[in-house]
Every structure is written in structure tokens, then in C-alpha cells.
């Protein structure tokens, strides 16, 4: 029989593995020319349909409370469902999976930065240094450690848009901590999905009007199945259960497995190379995350 800790470790490892796989599938979708906003639209439409029977009773029962908080929930939907997931898939059309997962791995540090800006949490000097170190790491990645690219501002489009995704999720996570909601997490997710889809629908139609139409077939069906079930629903429930078993602080450490899983899968599946600038960027990112989290953990203890 597994202990609580072992069960949590298994669930959290699977969570980060599935989230890393989302980058692999997103890259594969670009190779099969599956439109990024269309993929994200169908991902959340099917997730919404699956969750609907389980959440509708509470939505009806708590409709007044939901309406009272609809502005904040709408922002959560826009930053997570509409922007983050769409931009990740879009970015992978232009950048490497390794670059993407390394940049996304800095999100815990940017959550600290955004939380400080929005006066949600206080920031200490060590966390500020952590943000600076992580930023240096991101600069190494987007510039490929080439001073000429920095001077001429010649960056990969996918790296720049991945920064947008990175900050969008950081804003979402910071705002999520701002308030304790009086509805279940699964119902909150469903309302966030609905709000995000409302703003994603026009973008989906714009993408189609530009000639970016999905080609129905095995690649699309397999891609959609994965993104709905694994990084979408399964990871969400595993993450919640893992936090319940060992706490948010210990669970958060497992997010640092994403660049490891992502890089290994990218090198095996797409034959991507782990370049020297990836190494430099990773060193600064790891240092920034470690500095921020170690100090935060010490204070929380």
C-alpha cells in the first residue's frame, strides 16, 4: 500500500509529464498544420462538455455568487483559457520545445513579481534577485546568447510570443490567489472555461476566415484527445489531489520537472538539440527559481 506522500509524488510527476507532453503535442500540431487557436478552442469546448454534468447543479445553486465575482473570473478566463493556451500553441509554430519549456519554467518566479505589483503578496530582496536571474536566463534563450541579436533586436517570433504566454499565466495564478472562492474548484474551472471560450470564439472564427481550417483526420483526433484528457482534465485533478496530500509548497517543486521532461521528449521525438544558450539560460533560471523558492519556504516555515 502506497503512503500519502508516494501517491502524491506519482500524481504530481504524471501532472508535469502530461503538461510537458502538451508542448510536444503542440509542436506536432504545428507540423501537421493544425491551427493553434482552433486546437485550443476545441480543447476547451470538449473539456467544458465533459465537466458540464458535474458542475451544472452547483452553478445553478451558486449563480448569484458567481455573478457577483464574474469580473475577476472573466479575467481568469481570458488570461488562462483565451491567451495562455492559444499563445503556447501559436509559439510552438516558430520556436523549439526546449526553449518553450525552459521559459515557461520561470512562471513561479513571475507569479511572485506579479503578486507584488498587484499588492497581493509582499516581495523580499531575495525574490527580487530571483526575478532578475530568471529574466537573464530568458534573455539568453531568446537571444541565443548572441550579442548581435540583442543589439539588432532580432528575436524568434515564437520566443517573444511565449513571453506573452508566460506573463499571462503568471497574472492568472496571482489573481487566483487573491481571493478564496466559495465554490468548488471544479466549478470554478468550468466557469473560467466558459468565460475564456466567450473571448476565444471570435478569434477562432477570425483564424478560419484567414484560411486556417482544420483537416479532419487521425492527427487532429489524436492531438485533441490528448490535450483534452491529459494536460487538460487529468492534470488538473491530479494537481488538486497532490496539493491536498502534501501541500502547495511541496507540490510546486514538481513544476521544475517540466523542462527536464520536455527537453528529453523534444530531443527524442523531434531531434532537437540542447544548445549552449539553453544551458546558460537554464543555469540562471534554476538559480532564480531556487533563490525565490528557498527563501519563501524558509519564511513560511
Task: Identify the residue ranges that each predicted region occupies.
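Glycine-/small-residue-enriched transmembrane alpha-helix faces in small-molecule transporters
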Residues: 1-42, 151-178
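Specific transmembrane alpha-helical segments of multi-pass solute transporters/efflux pumps
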Residues: 18, 22-23, 52-99, 103-104, ...
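Membrane-interface helix-cap regions at the ends of transmembrane helices
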Residues: 27, 47-66, 136-152, 195-219, ...
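Helix-helix packing/entry segments at the starts of transmembrane helices
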Residues: 42, 81, 85, 99-106, ...
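Alpha-helical transmembrane segments of compact multi-pass small-molecule transporters, enriched
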Residues: 46-50, 103-117, 132, 195-199, ...
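Transmembrane alpha-helical segments that form core, pore/gating elements
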Residues: 51, 111-113, 117, 149-208, ...
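Loop-to-transmembrane alpha-helix entry segments
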Residues: 64-68, 101-104, 120-140, 155-159, ...
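Conserved small/polar residues in nucleotide/adenosyl-binding loops
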Residues: 298-301
Amino acid at each position: 500500500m502506497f503512503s500519502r506522500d508516494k501517491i502524491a509524488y506519482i500524481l504530481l510527476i504524471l501532472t508535469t509529464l502530461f503538461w510537458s507532453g502538451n508542448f510536444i503535442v503542440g509542436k506536432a500540431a504545428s507540423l501537421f498544420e493544425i491551427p493553434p487557436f482552433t486546437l485550443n478552442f476545441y480543447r476547451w469546448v470538449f473539456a467544458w462538455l465533459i465537466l458540464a454534468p458535474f458542475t451544472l447543479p452547483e452553478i445553478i445553486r451558486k449563480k448569484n455568487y458567481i455573478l457577483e465575482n464574474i469580473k475577476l473570473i472573466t479575467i481568469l478566463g481570458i488570461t488562462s483559457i483565451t491567451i495562455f493556451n492559444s499563445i503556447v500553441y501559436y509559439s510552438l509554430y516558430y520556436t523549439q520545445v526546449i526553449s518553450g519549456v525552459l521559459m515557461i519554467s520561470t512562471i513561479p518566479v513571475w507569479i511572485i513579481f506579479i503578486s507584488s505589483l498587484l499588492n497581493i503578496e509582499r516581495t523580499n530582496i531575495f525574490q527580487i534577485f530571483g526575478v532578475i536571474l530568471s529574466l537573464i536566463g530568458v534573455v539568453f534563450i531568446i537571444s541565443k546568447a548572441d550579442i548581435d541579436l540583442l543589439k539588432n533586436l532580432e528575436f524568434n517570433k515564437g520566443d517573444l510570443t511565449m513571453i506573452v504566454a508566460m506573463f499571462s499565466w503568471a497574472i492568472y495564478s496571482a489573481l487566483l490567489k487573491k481571493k478564496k472562492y466559495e465554490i468548488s474548484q471544479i466549478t470554478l474551472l468550468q466557469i473560467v472555461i466558459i468565460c475564456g471560450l466567450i473571448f476565444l470564439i471570435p478569434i477562432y472564427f477570425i483564424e478560419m476566415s484567414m484560411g486556417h481550417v482544420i483537416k479532419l483526420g487521425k492527427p487532429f483526433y489524436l492531438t485533441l484527445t490528448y490535450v483534452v484528457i491529459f494536460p487538460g482534465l487529468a492534470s488538473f485533478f491530479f494537481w488538486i489531489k497532490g496539493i491536498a496530500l502534501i501541500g502547495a509548497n511541496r507540490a510546486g517543486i514538481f513544476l521544475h520537472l517540466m523542462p527536464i521532461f520536455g527537453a528529453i521528449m523534444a530531443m527524442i521525438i523531434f531531434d532537437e538539440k540542447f544548445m549552449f544558450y539553453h544551458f546558460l539560460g537554464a543555469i540562471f533560471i534554476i538559480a532564480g527559481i531556487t533563490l525565490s523558492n528557498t527563501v519563501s519556504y524558509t519564511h513560511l516555515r
